[in-house]
Amino acid sequence: MSFIHKLIQKFKPKKKLVDQVQQAVQEKSFFQANQKSYYQGLNKSANSFANTINKLAANYVTVNEQFQESLFEELVLLDIGYHAATKICDAIVQELKLQRVSDPQLIQEIIVDKLIVYYIQDKLFETDLTVEANKTNVYLFVGVNGVGKTTSLAKLADQLTKQNKRVLMVAGDTFRAGAVAQLAEWAQRIGCDIVLPNPKEETPAVIFRGVQQGIQNEYDFVLCDTSGRLQNKTNLMNELKKIYQIVQKVSSAKPQETLLVLDGTTGQSGLAQAKVFNEFTELTGIILTKMDSSSKGGIILAIKDLFNLPVKLIGFGETTADLAAFDLEQYVLGLTKNLSLNHEPNQT
């Protein structure tokens, strides 16, 4: 059993009786993390992380002020964020001093240990997508332009359809040129039903029709695309609030998921987006895309630290299989695979 696996197991809750809803969730294989995707998709982040940690472990035999400054700088560069980096750095230095550690591998293990403990903070996040049994589940996809919002929706629709679920896509991005055609093409490729906007119809009206149709025809899932909006445009953000209220009115409940799609390569800009979107609507989770192109895997810690929001899905590439459920253990294994920790054999 690997060092990482042992560490994660300490925080896993004891198994409870599985009720109908939990069982429905567990039966859906699209919620499972793909270990191979994590190992291959996190190559850039893993190389960056290993270079950072190996350099620190090799350059400092004693834990002094210079070590602490270097550690803090490296954590910030990994996009962990100033607040989280400060707390994690203090915890690492305290532990290293307490144990009087000078062995480079032990230094690596303590750094990884404190990163995981900080993310978990006494309990594991619920990262499964919410699925209510015997009900139409409505998912809203929100975010700025260019983050992979429409593509992520289509990839999830494909995975759900392959599980024999009835899925209705709603092409609510009426602003971006080509967005409707893009989703319509995906629908044809997947074999999935879609609600398209009428001429000059705005996003809230399209979402209203789509959710209404999904409920009336007893679809399992209604996946709603929305127009990309800049977080500094108040009128667009207010429209998002209106869309959220429309779903509540039509379905007599909040959307099962309101997912903010973030580009994993944008770093602190993504955090600024999350802050504003979270103010205008009740986000339930994050979809982190383009992680195969990112060298800064620490953004997941920053999201957890600032907003207490779970990353629910993570994207590593172009195919539909490259959108995976977020799994902390697989993520950490992928991120630390180039360190000399006690890993299980690498997946290639």
Swiss-Prot record:
Keyword Nucleotide-binding attached: yes
Coiled coil stretches, renumbered: none
Entry binding sites for GTP: 143-150, 225-229, 289-292
Protein localization: Cell membrane; Cytoplasm
S-S bonds: none
One GO MF term attached to the UniProt entry: signal recognition particle binding
Gene3D superfamilies per record: P-loop containing nucleotide triphosphate hydrolases (3.40.50.300), Signal recognition particle SRP54, nucleotide-binding domain (1.20.120.140)
Keywords: Cell membrane, Cytoplasm, GTP-binding, Hydrolase, Membrane, Nucleotide-binding, Receptor
Gene Ontology biological process terms from the UniProt entry: SRP-dependent cotranslational protein targeting to membrane
InterPro entries: AAA+_ATPase, P-loop_NTPase, Signal_recog_particl_SRP54_hlx, SR_rcpt_FtsY, SRP/SRP_N, SRP54_GTPase_dom, SRP54_N_sf
Name of the molecule in the record: Signal recognition particle receptor FtsY
One GO cellular component term: cytoplasm
Protein purpose: Involved in targeting and insertion of nascent membrane proteins into the cytoplasmic membrane. Acts as a receptor for the complex formed by the signal recognition particle (SRP) and the ribosome-nascent chain (RNC).
